Amino acid sequence: MKKRNDLIKWVSVIAAMIVMPLHVRAEESTLRVMSYNIHRGGVVHLKQPLSQTAKVIQAAKADIVGIQETRSPRGDTLEDLAKLLGWNHDEGSCIVTRYEIVEHFKGGKDYKGGIKVKLASDKHAYIFNLHLPSHPYQPYQLLGIRPKWHKHTNNITFIKTEAETIEWAKKARGAEIGKLLRQVKSIPDKEVPVFVVGDFNEPSHLDWTEAAAKAGRHPIKVAYPTSTEMAKAGFSDSYRKIYPDEMKNLGLTWSPKYKLDDPTTHPDRIDFVYFKGKGLQVKDVKILGENEENADLVVSPYPSDHRAVVATLTLPKKTK
């Protein structure tokens, strides 16, 4: 009799869960957001086919990807990449996604703009994509590096102080980041998920710390203005949210082309996935790259000079 009563009890519990109102059941959905500089259309580095770039995105199991450098010597490859994935794409913002695109936001030369996508259960999210100027690049200015590959290599002013670094960074990228943040501020729903991804061509104040400078990882401590402005606007850096110790977890995205001790460059984390929104939480972040030493997910041959970053996030389902 006791066993029968226990069985009836559990059946009742399960039945109650089935008919429980949606607003009582606290469920979550998963979203993977990625930033990927594919380098000259994804067909130049190591002479890899575009399908290898698609393979990187597939390995990340991404849902939305902000792409930088879509133009190849033969033309723009964004549409072809979207076809390989079987996804939607937005030419203006250079974003590809498995979701329906319901709204477009115009950007400019470096701030690519953004889109609004329809997620499951009629939820929506916004994603904005950036590819900020690479010149002048403050780590090179501080370290006295003239990269042979850069067209502005003979037009670099060397600097020494944090104040100079911040000033030069603001001149290079301040206007574009300002445009982005004004557009984000104009979104009517202040609780909706918003993502900003891109190749920022500027390190983070969370990486260039006093501790990192004392350890010789960077020449000096710098409170870089772009990452600082993102934080002030309420955005979280997904990588540092999961890996707050900048001394232990480097998350380097620049660059698979060079060894870590190569004196002609400076290894750094300049590709980001930022997020904000009510109930939005990052659960995991992975770096995609060329080998296990430098990446969490390996695709070989790796078809870009930037490692990619993908963040897995959860958000509560829309309640009635």
Q: What residue ranges belong to the model's regions?
A:
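Short, solvent-exposed loop/turn elements at domain surfaces
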Residues: R40-K47, G66, P136-Q138, H205, ...
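Acidic/histidine-rich helix-loop elements
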Residues: S35-S51, S72, P133-A172
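Metal-dependent phosphoester-hydrolase catalytic domains
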Residues: G107, K116-K118, K185-F195, N201-K320
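Active-site beta-strand/loop signature of hydrolases that rely on acidic residues for catalysis
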Residues: L31-I38, T53-R74, I127-L130, E164-A211, ...
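N-terminal, active-site-proximal structural segment of metallo-dependent hydrolase catalytic domains
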Residues: K3, K9-I14, I18, L22-K83, ...
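Glycine-rich, phosphate-binding/catalytic loops in enzymes
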Residues: S51-Q52, L81-L84, G144-R146, A211-A215, ...
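Structured beta-strand-rich core segments of catalytic domains in phosphoester-bond hydrolases
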Residues: Q68-W149, I287
